[in-house]
Amino acid sequence: MSVEGKGFWIWKVKDCEGGDPAKIVAAAQAAGFSHVMVKIADGQYAYNLDRNSNTDLLAPVVDALKTAGIAVWGWHYVYGYSPTSEAAIAVKRTTELGLDGYVIDAEIEYTQPGRVTAARTFMDRVRTGLPNLPMALSSYRIPSYHPQLPWKEFLDKVDYNMPQVYWEKAHNPEPQLRRTVKEFEAKTPFRPVIPTGPAYRAGSWGPSTDDTQVFCDTAKKLGLKAVNFFSCDECKRDLPKIWD
Protein backbone atom coordinates (compact mmCIF):
# COMPACT_ATOMS: atom_id res chain seq x y z
CA MET A 1 0.00 0.00 0.00
CA SER A 2 1.56 3.30 -1.07
CA VAL A 3 1.10 6.42 1.05
CA GLU A 4 0.35 9.62 -0.83
CA GLY A 5 -1.20 12.98 -0.02
CA LYS A 6 -1.73 14.57 3.38
CA GLY A 7 -2.25 12.83 6.71
CA PHE A 8 -2.64 13.77 10.34
CA TRP A 9 -1.92 12.18 13.67
CA ILE A 10 -4.44 11.71 16.47
CA TRP A 11 -2.98 11.40 19.95
CA LYS A 12 -5.96 11.41 22.34
CA VAL A 13 -9.03 10.60 20.31
CA LYS A 14 -11.39 12.26 22.80
CA ASP A 15 -9.59 15.56 22.14
CA CYS A 16 -10.16 15.35 18.39
CA GLU A 17 -13.73 16.38 17.56
CA GLY A 18 -14.77 14.99 20.94
CA GLY A 19 -13.99 11.51 19.67
CA ASP A 20 -17.07 11.59 17.43
CA PRO A 21 -16.41 9.31 14.44
CA ALA A 22 -18.66 11.23 12.04
CA LYS A 23 -17.09 14.58 12.95
CA ILE A 24 -13.57 13.18 12.62
CA VAL A 25 -14.40 11.85 9.16
CA ALA A 26 -15.98 15.15 8.13
CA ALA A 27 -12.93 17.10 9.34
CA ALA A 28 -10.55 14.77 7.52
CA GLN A 29 -12.53 14.99 4.30
CA ALA A 30 -12.85 18.78 4.47
CA ALA A 31 -9.08 19.10 4.93
CA GLY A 32 -8.35 16.67 2.11
CA PHE A 33 -6.55 14.08 4.21
CA SER A 34 -5.90 10.71 2.59
CA HIS A 35 -4.71 8.95 5.73
CA VAL A 36 -4.82 9.22 9.51
CA MET A 37 -2.53 7.84 12.23
CA VAL A 38 -4.23 6.99 15.54
CA LYS A 39 -2.39 6.15 18.76
CA ILE A 40 -3.04 2.50 19.55
CA ALA A 41 -0.52 1.77 22.31
CA ASP A 42 1.97 3.29 24.72
CA GLY A 43 4.73 0.87 25.67
CA GLN A 44 3.14 -2.46 26.49
CA TYR A 45 -0.31 -1.01 27.12
CA ALA A 46 -3.25 -0.37 24.80
CA TYR A 47 -4.09 3.31 24.32
CA ASN A 48 -7.29 5.26 23.67
CA LEU A 49 -9.42 2.99 25.80
CA ASP A 50 -12.11 4.16 28.20
CA ARG A 51 -10.97 2.40 31.36
CA ASN A 52 -14.23 3.08 33.19
CA SER A 53 -16.45 1.39 30.63
CA ASN A 54 -13.74 -0.88 29.19
CA THR A 55 -14.58 0.52 25.75
CA ASP A 56 -12.19 0.82 22.83
CA LEU A 57 -12.59 4.43 21.71
CA LEU A 58 -10.74 3.83 18.45
CA ALA A 59 -12.82 1.02 16.93
CA PRO A 60 -15.76 3.18 15.74
CA VAL A 61 -13.40 5.92 14.54
CA VAL A 62 -11.29 3.47 12.54
CA ASP A 63 -14.39 1.88 11.01
CA ALA A 64 -15.85 5.26 10.04
CA LEU A 65 -12.63 6.49 8.46
CA LYS A 66 -12.11 3.29 6.49
CA THR A 67 -15.71 3.32 5.29
CA ALA A 68 -15.07 6.85 4.00
CA GLY A 69 -12.05 5.61 2.06
CA ILE A 70 -9.45 7.13 4.38
CA ALA A 71 -6.53 4.85 5.27
CA VAL A 72 -5.90 4.35 9.00
CA TRP A 73 -2.52 3.56 10.50
CA GLY A 74 -1.86 2.87 14.16
CA TRP A 75 1.04 4.53 15.95
CA HIS A 76 2.77 3.23 19.03
CA TYR A 77 5.19 4.97 21.38
CA VAL A 78 7.83 2.40 22.31
CA TYR A 79 10.35 2.45 25.17
CA GLY A 80 12.44 -0.69 24.70
CA TYR A 81 12.20 -1.80 28.32
CA SER A 82 10.03 -4.80 27.43
CA PRO A 83 10.29 -5.28 23.67
CA THR A 84 8.46 -8.61 23.61
CA SER A 85 5.46 -7.18 25.47
CA GLU A 86 5.48 -4.07 23.31
CA ALA A 87 5.53 -6.20 20.17
CA ALA A 88 2.65 -8.31 21.47
CA ILE A 89 0.38 -5.31 22.06
CA ALA A 90 1.36 -3.87 18.66
CA VAL A 91 0.27 -7.04 16.88
CA LYS A 92 -2.89 -7.37 18.98
CA ARG A 93 -4.11 -3.80 18.52
CA THR A 94 -3.23 -3.60 14.84
CA THR A 95 -4.97 -6.88 14.09
CA GLU A 96 -8.12 -6.32 16.14
CA LEU A 97 -8.64 -2.84 14.69
CA GLY A 98 -7.98 -3.97 11.11
CA LEU A 99 -5.48 -1.20 10.47
CA ASP A 100 -3.87 -0.37 7.14
CA GLY A 101 -0.40 0.23 8.59
CA TYR A 102 1.66 0.54 11.75
CA VAL A 103 4.05 3.30 12.89
CA ILE A 104 6.80 2.87 15.51
CA ASP A 105 7.44 6.07 17.47
CA ALA A 106 10.92 5.58 18.99
CA GLU A 107 12.52 8.55 20.71
CA ILE A 108 14.71 9.34 23.73
CA GLU A 109 14.36 5.96 25.47
CA TYR A 110 15.88 4.30 22.43
CA THR A 111 19.02 6.44 22.67
CA GLN A 112 19.98 4.70 25.92
CA PRO A 113 22.70 2.02 26.00
CA GLY A 114 21.72 -1.51 25.03
CA ARG A 115 18.82 -0.59 22.81
CA VAL A 116 20.15 -2.27 19.67
CA THR A 117 19.17 -5.68 21.00
CA ALA A 118 15.80 -4.38 22.16
CA ALA A 119 15.07 -2.87 18.74
CA ARG A 120 16.08 -6.06 16.96
CA THR A 121 13.91 -8.21 19.25
CA PHE A 122 10.96 -5.87 18.91
CA MET A 123 11.13 -5.60 15.15
CA ASP A 124 11.60 -9.33 14.62
CA ARG A 125 8.50 -10.09 16.68
CA VAL A 126 6.37 -7.36 15.13
CA ARG A 127 7.32 -8.42 11.62
CA THR A 128 6.58 -12.05 12.44
CA GLY A 129 3.14 -11.08 13.73
CA LEU A 130 2.38 -8.62 10.91
CA PRO A 131 4.38 -10.00 7.98
CA ASN A 132 2.65 -8.14 5.16
CA LEU A 133 1.55 -4.92 6.82
CA PRO A 134 3.12 -1.61 5.72
CA MET A 135 5.19 -0.14 8.55
CA ALA A 136 7.01 3.10 9.25
CA LEU A 137 9.48 4.53 11.73
CA SER A 138 8.77 7.92 13.29
CA SER A 139 11.70 9.45 15.12
CA TYR A 140 14.10 12.39 15.12
CA ARG A 141 14.51 14.61 12.06
CA ILE A 142 18.33 14.82 12.18
CA PRO A 143 19.81 11.33 12.64
CA SER A 144 23.36 12.63 13.06
CA TYR A 145 22.24 14.30 16.30
CA HIS A 146 21.09 10.93 17.67
CA PRO A 147 23.64 8.30 16.58
CA GLN A 148 22.83 6.10 19.59
CA LEU A 149 19.36 5.34 18.27
CA PRO A 150 19.35 1.94 16.48
CA TRP A 151 18.33 3.36 13.13
CA LYS A 152 19.37 0.35 11.07
CA GLU A 153 17.53 -2.17 13.23
CA PHE A 154 14.29 -0.21 12.80
CA LEU A 155 14.71 0.80 9.17
CA ASP A 156 15.65 -2.73 8.10
CA LYS A 157 12.11 -3.91 8.87
CA VAL A 158 9.93 -0.95 7.86
CA ASP A 159 8.72 0.37 4.52
CA TYR A 160 8.66 4.12 5.22
CA ASN A 161 10.46 6.72 7.29
CA MET A 162 8.24 9.38 8.93
CA PRO A 163 10.71 11.74 10.66
CA GLN A 164 9.37 14.40 12.99
CA VAL A 165 10.46 17.59 11.22
CA TYR A 166 9.54 20.03 13.99
CA TRP A 167 11.15 23.45 13.52
CA GLU A 168 10.31 24.62 17.05
CA LYS A 169 11.40 28.14 18.03
CA ALA A 170 12.06 28.95 14.36
CA HIS A 171 10.29 29.48 11.05
CA ASN A 172 12.59 27.67 8.64
CA PRO A 173 10.79 24.55 7.39
CA GLU A 174 12.55 24.41 4.02
CA PRO A 175 16.17 24.06 5.21
CA GLN A 176 15.03 21.78 8.02
CA LEU A 177 13.23 19.41 5.67
CA ARG A 178 16.01 19.50 3.09
CA ARG A 179 18.57 18.54 5.72
CA THR A 180 16.35 15.74 7.01
CA VAL A 181 15.98 14.20 3.58
CA LYS A 182 19.67 14.62 2.75
CA GLU A 183 20.79 12.88 5.95
CA PHE A 184 18.40 9.97 5.55
CA GLU A 185 19.37 9.53 1.90
CA ALA A 186 22.90 8.90 3.18
CA LYS A 187 21.77 6.18 5.61
CA THR A 188 21.46 2.48 4.86
CA PRO A 189 18.87 1.26 4.34
CA PHE A 190 17.04 4.21 2.83
CA ARG A 191 13.28 4.22 3.12
CA PRO A 192 10.92 6.68 1.40
CA VAL A 193 10.57 9.78 3.56
CA ILE A 194 7.13 10.98 4.64
CA PRO A 195 7.85 13.92 6.94
CA THR A 196 5.63 14.98 9.82
CA GLY A 197 5.34 18.71 10.35
CA PRO A 198 4.28 20.50 13.54
CA ALA A 199 0.67 21.55 14.04
CA TYR A 200 0.88 22.37 17.75
CA ARG A 201 2.11 25.08 20.09
CA ALA A 202 5.30 24.86 22.16
CA GLY A 203 5.05 27.65 24.71
CA SER A 204 4.60 30.90 22.80
CA TRP A 205 5.81 29.36 19.54
CA GLY A 206 3.66 27.88 16.84
CA PRO A 207 4.08 27.29 13.11
CA SER A 208 2.63 29.97 10.86
CA THR A 209 0.35 29.32 7.92
CA ASP A 210 3.25 30.33 5.68
CA ASP A 211 5.47 27.77 7.43
CA THR A 212 2.96 25.04 6.71
CA GLN A 213 2.65 25.99 3.05
CA VAL A 214 6.42 26.15 2.60
CA PHE A 215 6.74 22.74 4.27
CA CYS A 216 4.26 21.20 1.83
CA ASP A 217 5.80 22.99 -1.16
CA THR A 218 9.30 21.83 -0.19
CA ALA A 219 8.11 18.25 0.11
CA LYS A 220 6.78 18.46 -3.45
CA LYS A 221 10.04 19.97 -4.72
CA LEU A 222 11.92 17.07 -3.15
CA GLY A 223 9.63 14.55 -4.81
CA LEU A 224 8.09 13.31 -1.56
CA LYS A 225 4.76 11.58 -2.07
CA ALA A 226 3.14 12.50 1.25
CA VAL A 227 3.32 14.69 4.33
CA ASN A 228 1.80 14.38 7.79
CA PHE A 229 0.95 16.78 10.61
CA PHE A 230 0.95 16.33 14.39
CA SER A 231 -1.68 16.57 15.71
CA CYS A 232 -5.43 16.90 15.24
CA ASP A 233 -5.96 17.19 19.00
CA GLU A 234 -3.86 20.33 19.35
CA CYS A 235 -4.17 21.91 15.92
CA LYS A 236 -7.91 22.43 15.84
CA ARG A 237 -7.87 23.77 19.39
CA ASP A 238 -4.75 25.96 19.34
CA LEU A 239 -4.01 26.68 15.67
CA PRO A 240 -7.32 26.76 13.79
CA LYS A 241 -5.85 28.82 10.94
CA ILE A 242 -3.30 26.07 10.29
CA TRP A 243 -6.06 23.48 10.13
CA ASP A 244 -8.14 25.61 7.78
What spans do the regions from the language model cover?
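Boundary/entry segment of secreted carbohydrate-active catalytic domains
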Residues: 1-34, 39-41, 76-80, 132, ...
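Structural preference for beta-strand elements that scaffold enzyme active sites
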Residues: 3-9, 34-37, 69-73, 100-103, ...
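Aromatic-lined carbohydrate-recognition surfaces of secreted/lumenal glycan-active proteins
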Residues: 8-13, 70-83, 119-149, 190-203
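Short, acidic/polar
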Residues: 13-30, 82-96, 143-154, 177, ...
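Active-site groove signature of glycoside hydrolases
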Residues: 34-46, 89-118, 226-229
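Aromatic-lined substrate-binding rim segments of carbohydrate-active enzymes
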Residues: 38, 42-76, 113-137
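Extracellular glycoside hydrolase catalytic/binding regions
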Residues: 111-116, 133-182, 204-217
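Substrate-binding cleft of secreted/luminal carbohydrate-active enzymes
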Residues: 166-170, 183, 189-244
